[in-house]
């Protein structure tokens, strides 16, 4: 800890995995006043939302058990970052002054307007509110009513598995492939588990229309669906673009390799909403923690007048649960490409559960107790050298103008 007379005001926007960890880690200095802005009064374990929807687990934690001493929690939503006046405008009408902002607003996942009927009839599971709506819809639905899950990624797989294990009649529409980021052997394991447990897996297949009681496939086929769950694709909030900050095509804040905005060195990004060098890391709970830590370290370095370090993160693989009694841990190279090795079955389920607990207990809570203590695997590939804001802005390619 260091002692100073002047407090540096840091506003962290978003209380997910990246933002909450960043808020805790900022306390390596005792001259930093940290305000965490989040639209909900509780922390949401996003990687457990499929359990919450299926009533096989909870997905919220009281912030009082997660935040370090002295952090102010403001339950509100940011509507604009005014870099000229260094203020964050909130939905309530309140304005927060800042010296630095950590932009950790996360990602979203709503049914796309481009698919007829999806917005009106499909339900997402990407956020707590949508998962709660899904839970209520499931409660009102007969057990044998057909449920369609759209999306063959990890969220879709976990949702389908959780529901079929509860006795639901589930169809999984996979798009081009099931678990496309996994190895061939890992994909076969998942496909076999789903088939044995009664999930009807359609691949390759795509949904071209969602109706109140059915889905229409791209090949013209119609499948009955009393409830359609949309898990395909993610987006991000438009706060950065609405604030006149440059973003990539998806809306993620463009930064250099220290996670500093290409437009303003007092705005630092973390988690799913960051696009360092126009080459963002995989949107994931795995990357969120290290990115939150690096964002906090960048702010601390700027306060101290030292050069911030660049991103250094190696991936090790990914986990997916298959109900409560099975799962798979897919191993990967440092660059996040899968190798032909996985751990399945009950051991895979145990690894997934330990991973979920680790993110909260050994990362977020440990940073609350001992700021600066978190470490993570390093050595993954990134653009060579320190990429400056100007270089990032000129080479990003897909940039949305302010």
Regions found by a protein language model. Name each.
Residues 1-7, 71-146, 229:
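FAD-binding core/adjacent interface of flavoenzyme oxidoreductases
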Residues 2-72, 158-184, 402:
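Beta1-alpha1 glycine-rich phosphate/pyrophosphate-binding loop at the start
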Residues 12-14, 103, 150-151:
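Conserved N-terminal Rossmann-fold NAD(P)-binding element of oxidoreductases
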Residues 15, 105-106, 112, 219, ...:
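Glycine-rich, N-terminal phosphate-binding loop of Rossmann-like dinucleotide-binding domains
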Residues 72-81, 85-88, 96, 166-257, ...:
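A Rossmann-like FAD-binding core segment of flavoenzymes
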Residues 118-143, 222-290:
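FAD-site-proximal beta/loop scaffold in flavoenzymes
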Residues 241, 249, 273-323:
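A conserved FAD-binding loop/helix module that cradles the flavin
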Residues 324-402:
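C-terminal auxiliary extensions adjacent to catalytic cores
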């Amino acid at each position: 800890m260091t002692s100073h007379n002047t407090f540096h005001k840091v506003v962290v926007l978003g209380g997910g995995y990246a933002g909450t960890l960043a808020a805790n880690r900022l306390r390596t200095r005792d001259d930093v006043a940290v305000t965490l802005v989040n639209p909900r009064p509780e922390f949401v374990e996003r990687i457990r939302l499929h359990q919450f929807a299926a009533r096989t687990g909870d997905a919220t934690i009281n912030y009082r058990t997660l935040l370090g001493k002295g952090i102010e929690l403001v339950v509100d939503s940011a509507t604009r970052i005014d870099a000229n006046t260094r203020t964050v405008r909130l939905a309530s009408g309140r304005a927060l002054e800042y010296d630095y902002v950590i932009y950790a607003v996360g990602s979203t996942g709503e049914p796309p307007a481009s698919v007829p009927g999806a917005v009106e009839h499909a339900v997402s599971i990407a956020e707590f509110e949508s998962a709660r709506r899904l839970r209520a819809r499931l409660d009102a639905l007969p057990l044998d009513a057909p449920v369609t899950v759209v999306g063959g990624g990890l969220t879709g797989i976990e949702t389908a598995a959780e529901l079929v294990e509860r006795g639901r009649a589930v169809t999984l529409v996979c798009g081009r492939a099931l678990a496309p980021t996994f190895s061939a052997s890992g994909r076969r394991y998942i496909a076999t588990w789903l088939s044995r447990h009664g999930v009807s897996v359609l691949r390759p297949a795509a949904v071209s229309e969602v109706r109140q009681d059915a889905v229409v496939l791209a090949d013209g086929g119609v499948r009955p669906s009393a409830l359609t769950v949309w898990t395909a694709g993610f987006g991000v909030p438009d706060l950065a673009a609405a604030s006149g900050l440059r973003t990539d095509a998806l809306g993620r804040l463009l930064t250099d390799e220290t996670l500093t905005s290409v437009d303003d060195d007092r705005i630092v990004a973390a988690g799913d909403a960051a696009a360092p060098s126009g080459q963002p890391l995989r949107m994931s709970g795995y990357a969120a923690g290290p990115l939150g830590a690096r964002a906090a370290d960048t702010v601390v370095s700027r306060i101290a007048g030292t050069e911030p370090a660049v991103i250094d993160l190696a991936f090790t693989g990914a986990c997916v649960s298959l109900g409560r009694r099975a799962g798979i841990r897919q191993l990967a190279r440092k660059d996040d490409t899968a190798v032909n090795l996985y751990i399945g079955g009950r051991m895979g389920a145990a690894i997934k559960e330990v991973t979920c607990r680790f993110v909260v207990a050994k990362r977020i809570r440990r940073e609350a107790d001992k700021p600066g203590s978190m470490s993570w695997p390093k050595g993954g590939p990134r653009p060579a050298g320190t990429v400056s804001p100007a270089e990032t802005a000129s080479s990003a390619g897909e940039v949305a103008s302010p």
